[in-house]
Amino acid sequence: MAQEQTKRGGGGGEDDDLTGSTAAGQERREKLTDETDDLLDEIDDVLEENAEDFVRAYVQKGGQ
């Protein structure tokens, strides 16, 4: 049984843009985290108010 390994080179020489994209990536990550937390809080509120209907609707839509 033979196995082949392929090595791929990176972008090469684009390290100067790394700090700018890292800061932008961090900002985007924080924004997405906040949005996700808000969405999860909203789901928690719905489940606290009416979990039975939520589960019933989920099962009717084909959930398992």
From Swiss-Prot:
UniProt keyword list: Coiled coil, Isopeptide bond, Ubl conjugation pathway
Residues forming coiled coils: 23-52
GO biological process: modification-dependent protein catabolic process; proteasomal protein catabolic process; protein pupylation
Residues carrying Deamidated glutamine: 64
GO molecular function list: proteasome binding; protein tag activity
Pfam families according to UniProt: Pup
Stretches the record annotates as Disordered: 1-37
Cross-referenced InterPro entries: Ubiquitin-like_Pup
Segments of this protein annotated with the region ARC ATPase binding: 21-58
Recorded domain comment: The N-terminal unstructured half of Pup provides a signal required to initiate unfolding and degradation by the proteasome but is not needed for pupylation, while the C-terminal helical half of Pup interacts with ARC to target proteins to the proteasome.
Function: Protein modifier that is covalently attached to lysine residues of substrate proteins, thereby targeting them for proteasomal degradation. The tagging system is termed pupylation.
Protein's UniProt name: Prokaryotic ubiquitin-like protein Pup
Organism: Mycolicibacterium vanbaalenii (strain DSM 7251 / JCM 13017 / BCRC 16820 / KCTC 9966 / NRRL B-24157 / PYR-1) (Mycobacterium vanbaalenii)
